[in-house]
């Protein structure tokens, strides 16, 4: 088995999918997990990008079906901007498409700013922009878990195969969640699900961005990764890619293994 094949198997990626069936399976997963845990619904941060739009719509469909079955469940969508978000119109368009039961908005700027100021006061040095970006992601996670805990809701994560293979998420930030309905999907497969669901086209054709850096606002994921999502998706779907692309993806995959595992202990073998 090649490393490419091993990665495909580990991340549960299929070379091709049928969007309608995938939607049904993933909504079914959300419903089954909620019933198993006894929780009362879901919470998810909505950015206006492809991944949270898709996960949010799946969550809303799941709770609506549960209510039709006589099980009370709700979905809370939460906006978590850092000050004024440049693509706020997209976030509002995503909420209009998702139609969540409830939506809240928390501006995380003051919380992040207070921490950054305290960090500089205590250590004598400014928090680097990259690490401040990770603080933003983790404050968003804390907010979602506060809402979830207060309302007995499960926190949904938006991680998918293209992020998992590259480790392109913040550990205990956007990587902190209770369940992941997009697992196994490549970026283009996620787009096909949104097309099937009738999402506004601009929400899945826009350039994806984590938008965590003050110094590089709206920097695209592809610029930060040095790889295109088409390259990553081709690799994950078992297609031929250049040796340079394969090496870059595999290097990131190996370096980010710790992000796909629970914290290491001396009894684990994965890190050896």
From Swiss-Prot:
Catalytic function, reaction form: deamido-NAD(+) + NH4(+) + ATP = AMP + diphosphate + NAD(+) + H(+)
Q: Membrane-spanning regions, if any?
A: none
Give one GO molecular function term: NAD+ synthase activity
Q: Alphabetically, which GO biological process terms does the record hold? A: NAD biosynthetic process
Q: Does the keyword Membrane apply?
A: no
Which EC numbers characterise this protein's activity in its record?
Answer: 6.3.1.5
Q: Where does deamido-NAD(+) bind?
A: 138, 171, 178, 258-259
Superkingdom in the source lineage: Bacteria
Q: Which UniProt keywords apply?
A: ATP-binding, Ligase, Magnesium, Metal-binding, NAD, Nucleotide-binding
Q: Where does Mg(2+) bind?
A: 51, 163
**Pathway where it operates:** Cofactor biosynthesis; NAD(+) biosynthesis; NAD(+) from deamido-NAD(+) (ammonia route): step 1/1
Record-listed ATP binding positions: 45-52, 158, 187, 209
Q: Which GO terms describe its cellular component?
A: cytoplasm
Alphabetical list of CDD domains matching this protein: NAD_synthase
Tell me yes or no: is Nucleotide-binding among this UniProt entry's keywords.
yes
Give the matching PANTHER family: NH 3 /GLUTAMINE-DEPENDENT NAD + SYNTHETASE (PTHR23090), NH(3)-DEPENDENT NAD(+) SYNTHETASE (PTHR23090:SF7)
| Quaternary structure, from the entry | Homodimer.
For this chain, the family text in UniProt reads: Belongs to the NAD synthetase family.
Task: Give the protein's biological function.
Answer: Catalyzes the ATP-dependent amidation of deamido-NAD to form NAD. Uses ammonia as a nitrogen source.
The protein in question is named NH(3)-dependent NAD(+) synthetase
Supply the source organism for this entry: Bacillus licheniformis (strain ATCC 14580 / DSM 13 / JCM 2505 / CCUG 7422 / NBRC 12200 / NCIMB 9375 / NCTC 10341 / NRRL NRS-1264 / Gibson 46)
Give the encoding gene's name. nadE
């Amino acid at each position: 088995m090649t490393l490419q094949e091993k990665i495909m198997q580990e991340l549960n990626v299929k070379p091709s999918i049928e969007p309608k069936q995938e939607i049904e399976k993933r909504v079914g997963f959300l419903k089954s997990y909620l019933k198993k845990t006894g929780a009362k619904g879901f919470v998810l941060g909505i950015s206006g990008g492809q991944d949270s739009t898709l996960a949010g719509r799946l969550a809303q469909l799941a709770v609506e079906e549960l209510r039709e079955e006589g099980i009370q469940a709700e979905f809370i969508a939460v906006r978590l901007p850092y000050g004024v978000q440049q693509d706020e119109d997209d976030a509002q368009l995503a909420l209009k498409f998702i139609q969540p039961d409830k939506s809240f908005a928390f501006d995380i700027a003051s919380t992040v700013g207070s921490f950054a100021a305290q960090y500089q006061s205590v250590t004598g040095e400014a928090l680097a922009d990259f690490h401040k970006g990770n603080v933003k992601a983790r404050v968003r996670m804390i907010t979602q878990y506060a809402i979830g805990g207060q309302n007995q809701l499960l926190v949904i994560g938006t991680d998918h195969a293209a992020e998992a293979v590259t480790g392109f998420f913040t550990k205990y930030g956007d990587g902190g969640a209770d369940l992941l309905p997009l697992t196994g999907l490549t970026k283009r497969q996620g787009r096909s699900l949104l097309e099937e669901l009738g999402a506004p086209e601009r929400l899945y054709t826009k350039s994806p961005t984590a938008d965590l850096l003050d110094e590089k606002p709206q920097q695209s994921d592809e610029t930060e990764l040095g790889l295109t999502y088409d390259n990553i998706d081709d690799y994950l779907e078992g297609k031929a890619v250049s040796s340079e692309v394969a090496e870059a993806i595999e290097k990131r995959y190996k370096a980010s293994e710790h992000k796909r595992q629970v914290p290491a202990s001396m009894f684990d073998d994965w890190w050896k």
